[in-house]
Regions:
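Positively charged, low-complexity terminal tracts
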Residues: 22-199
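Bacterial N-terminal signal peptides
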Residues: 7-17
Length: 199
């Protein structure tokens, strides 16, 4: 047999048998894709959480769990410490779980110094109504440094509603009533009062 034909035949066999192996994907990804991670931590709590080769301690108090339209929302007051250099941060963590066949979770950290701004932002967006514009629809939003986003908007038929979202790429969104938003605001005030005690 001709050596050129033999080489071509060998290359074809390699392509037929090795092609499917090369086309297979690697195992599951447990971390968010790199494009979803901010280059630098945006809150003090995230800065401590993202450290490696350190002992990080966390203390937390649970303040509320709300289930609204297939989303479970959890609010905790949190304290984190890095035992290596005595760095300490306190604040809130709000986690959203999307219930169902493929549950998803996302959470947002809110530093203590940002809580008052969050409360004012929640109060401001909750007061927004159709008088802010002469157009048919309206929307107001407030976003924290840790990517917790609160929206208040006009629904087509049923008046004003709110939403709470967490995350960068794979966002989890809870649809709320204005009463739900006010309850959450009350729980945040309670959690801040607890953090004031340990500040």
């Amino acid at each position: 047999m001709n050596p050129v034909r033999l080489a071509l035949f060998a290359v074809m066999l390699l392509m037929v048998f090795c092609g499917p192996v090369l086309a297979q994907r690697s195992g599951p990804e447990f971390r968010r894709p790199l494009a979803c991670e901010p280059l630098e931590p945006r809150t003090r709590l995230e800065a401590i959480e993202s450290r490696y080769e350190r002992v990080i301690t966390k203390g937390f108090s649970h303040f509320a769990t709300m289930t609204v339209r297939g989303i479970e929302l959890r609010l905790d007051a949190i304290e984190m410490k890095d035992s290596t250099d005595s760095t300490r941060a306190i604040g809130l963590v709000i986690a959203l779980w999307e219930l169902g066949e493929k549950p998803r979770e996302n959470r947002s950290f809110i530093d203590y110094q940002e809580i008052d701004r969050l409360l004012k932002g929640m109060e401001s967006v909750a007061r927004v109504n159709e008088t802010i514009t002469k157009l048919a629809g309206f929307e107001a939003r407030y976003r924290t440094l840790g990517d917790l986003e609160i929206n208040v908007f006009r629904q087509t038929r049923s008046g004003t509603a709110a939403s709470l979202s967490s995350g960068i790429c794979d966002r989890v969104t809870a649809l709320l009533t204005l009463d739900d938003l006010e309850k959450l605001r009350g729980h945040i005030i309670e959690a801040k009062a607890r953090l004031d005690e340990i500040k």
